Amino acid sequence: MAKFVISPHFRLHEWVAEEKGYFRDEGLDYEFRDVFKTHATPDRVGAYTSFEKGRETNVSCACHWTVNVAASQGLGKMVADCYSISPGGVFVPPESPIREPKDLKGVPISVGHQSGSHYSTLQALEQYLPREDIKLSFADGILFGRMEKLIDRQVPAAALFSGPYYFAEQLGFRKVIDTTFMMASMLTGDPDPEDVRKYFRALRRAQRDIDLRPELHTRHYAKEFPQRFLGEIDTRRWGPGERIVFEPYTREVFEESFKWIAEREIFEPGTMGAGRFEEACISLAQRSDERTPA
């Protein structure tokens, strides 16, 4: 039987579950595989593009908006049993004159195209600016790519999450506005449903460990961080980042999110799929006779 292929996606959970042996305890035969070979991606290439190309994994993550549309297009199945919350923010250099969200009017903000930073930056800034005054740049790479350009002062502002969020804080970069957003999981290929359950049971245990003693686990950020910065990052100062919420991603949330994306024309009209929850999503919730390991 083929291995269950997992993409960690810049968070702590998979690394904690591996180190603690939680996948092994479940009897899961797995391997980790990166979705993105480089973060210096071309203009308008982001999370959705990777789903269109075809992710060589059985389970991976992205923002819930992109997973919503990708699943609606038949590019995989959105897991409806849980979601996660990722701290995020728009950062500027410490010497920048930009101090308030309204100061971002007309300023190019580096985000990933059709990725979490794209949607969440719009969602946050619409409270302050009309849409025509929000200027997003899609040409600066995905997460680590745009972080590096911000640090090198090649871009005036960038949306960051996960380790780069905490590294920017460590370096004294200023968060102008919070852009915390929801993540979701996508199943691709044809994984065994029981393997998927094993995976999420292991992540549930890892989440508890991270909640209890985050300082023991933030070192795992280094495993996906660019080599250039490994001598500079101090993960002891960083927070736990993304948190998995084992509550349903409901039909109402799915439909509201699909409508929100369509209203902002983030995708060309007619290219988002049918937006039917029952076709796009799958529930693999534990049966009542199953128990999470202690």
Q: What are the residue ranges of the model-derived segments?
A:
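Positions that flank functional sites
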Residues: 38, 67, 165, 183, ...
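Structural motif
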Residues: 112, 137-141
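Pocket-lining segment of extracytoplasmic ligand-binding domains
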Residues: 142-224
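Short, glycine-/small- and polar/acidic-enriched structural segments
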Residues: 1-131, 156, 175-179
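Proline/Glycine/Serine-rich low-complexity intrinsically disordered segments
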Residues: 95-99, 126, 133, 190-197, ...
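Secondary-structure end/capping motifs
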Residues: 194-268
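Conserved C-terminal helix/tail region of periplasmic/extracytoplasmic solute-binding proteins
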Residues: 262-294
